[in-house]
Amino acid sequence: MAQELKVKSFSVAINDLSASVETVPDKNGDPCALVKILLVDSIVKVEGFVLKTKSVSPTEKWVYLSSGAKEVRIMPTHYKPISIYFPNFGVKGVEGKRTYILDLEADHPLVLNQ
């Protein structure tokens, strides 16, 4: 049975300049926002206004979204997919050249059959 994830936190990383240093343009040439997803599982797919993804470590994936994006859907390997609507966490829409941290956690620890 697949376990569910929940958002531990989602916020702007004011001192993190990654989105301005590693700028990714959207289809109109405008700079994207960067959402750093923290999760103790691999992520199979991310849906939304995603322009680029980058696996930084086994527990961190960078996702570049078009400025103004309000949500993202994440499909991890061992958990049910989760949709995150940013306005529920005080962010009306992500802004270009800004970095956000999305920290996800499970209700229960992941137990794999051996």
Question: Which residues does each predicted region cover?
Answer:
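Short loop/turn and low-complexity linker motifs enriched in small/turn-promoting residues
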Residues: 3-114
